[in-house]
Swiss-Prot record:
GO biological process, one term: response to oxidative stress
Protein name per UniProt: Peroxidase 38
Residues that coordinate or bind Ca(2+) 2: 193, 244, 247, 252
Organism per entry: Arabidopsis thaliana
InterPro entries referenced in this protein's UniProt entry, alphabetically: Haem_peroxidase, Haem_peroxidase_sf, Peroxidase_pln, Peroxidases_AS, Peroxidases_heam-ligand_BS, Secretory_peroxidase
Modified residues (Pyrrolidone carboxylic acid): 23
Length: 346
């Protein structure tokens, strides 16, 4: 009975998404590129062999893409003379990663289905497959997005939640992009159930919280001692620390168990449980900690909503041939490559 209700709820959610964004559909590539899902999965599986972090990194790319002008693959663009890349924004600089895997994925898709699958759709599919490979839930990704023609670094600086954000700031950032439900914020924050963060993002919590010269009082004392060993006061701040001390490579509900024990890694995570303003988020943390299925159901609903934010569809934008550059640049680079190849035979 419970399973049937979940399926019914999922179908109703897809109907809601399709009514809001009629051009997005889980069957969008059924006839034009049905192999896209296998290509994406195989690329991630191969990458995981040498990089256990890559699944979490790809999910983060999708999150940070959708929070800036909708899910349009703008985060994948490199710098040009006309705009600064989102890769240079505070929330991405020296931390966003996985672009080489995205390049391999796109090259394989272009070989199989030329000029068919957008980078934005590919990234949304890759985020889902990354979660599934890490033990998380599966869902049908609504597709049909197209790619932006530019990046938005300033908007990324304004929209992306930061590691030291208060609960009020988090709610404001989510509301600004169209995610105004507490369940969206708490469920999507569960993406931190795997992956790593750098010491630089928690140093204030460990040593000088709120300019007090003291650690964050919400931090569990034993966890504080552990983190201080990993991130000494004058140590290398690029050292990586697991978000989830229990199951760092699995997509599960242990993130919320950690929050209940005051063992959230970054301030913005612990705020969901420990903030004085957490009257609406604290019960959700408890519910997700007590039931992994409850968390999975909420996460799927929230990520479908997020991935359907303000998509470019129809003839808007383009389908990039190379996710790093808009197509006019891709064509120029192809001409240059062809010329260099020709010259090598002269």
């Amino acid at each position: 009975m419970h399973s049937s209700l979940i399926k019914l709820g999922f179908l109703l959610l897809l109907l809601q998404v399709s009514l809001s964004h009629a051009q997005l559909s889980p069957s969008f590539y059924d006839k034009t590129c049905p192999q896209v899902f296998d290509i994406v999965t195989n690329t991630i599986v191969n990458a995981l062999r040498s990089d256990p972090r890559i699944a979490a990194s790809i999910l983060r790319l999708h999150f940070h893409d959708c929070f800036v002008n909708g899910c349009d693959a703008s985060i994948l663009l490199d710098n040009t003379t006309s705009f600064r890349t989102e890769k240079d924004a505070f929330g991405n600089a020296n931390s966003a990663r996985g672009f080489d895997v995205i390049d391999k994925m796109k090259a394989a898709i272009e070989k199989a289905c030329p000029r068919t699958v957008s980078c934005a759709d590919m990234l949304a599919i890759a985020a889902k497959e990354s979660i599934v490979l890490a033990g998380g839930p599966s869902w049908m990704v609504p597709n049909g997005r197209r790619d932006s023609l530019r990046g938005f670094m300033d908007l990324a600086n304004d929209n992306l939640p930061g590691p030291s954000s208060t609960l009020k700031q988090l709610k404001d950032r989510f509301k600004n992009v169209g995610l105004d439900r507490s369940s969206d914020l708490v469920a999507l924050s569960g993406g931190h159930t795997f992956g790593k963060s750098q010491c630089q993002f928690i140093m204030d919590r460990l040593y000088n919280f709120g300019e007090t010269g003291l650690p964050d009082p919400t931090l569990d004392k034993s966890y504080l001692a552990t983190l201080r060993k990993q991130c000494p006061r004058n140590g290398n701040q690029s050292v990586l620390v697991d978000f989830d001390l229990r199951t760092p490579t699995l997509f599960d509900n242990k993130y919320y168990v950690n929050l209940k024990e005051n063992k959230g890694l970054i301030q913005s995570d612990q705020e969901l449980f420990s903030s004085p303003d957490a009257a609406d988020t604290l019960p959700l943390v408890r519910a997700y900690a007590d039931g992994q299925g409850t968390f999975f159901d909420a996460f799927v609903k929230a990520i479908i909503r997020m991935s359907s934010l303000s998509p470019l569809t129809g003839k808007q934008g383009e389908i990039r041939l190379n996710c790093r550059v808009v197509n006019s640049k891709s064509k120029i680079m192809d001409v240059v490559d062809d010329a260099l190849e020709f010259a090598s035979f002269m």
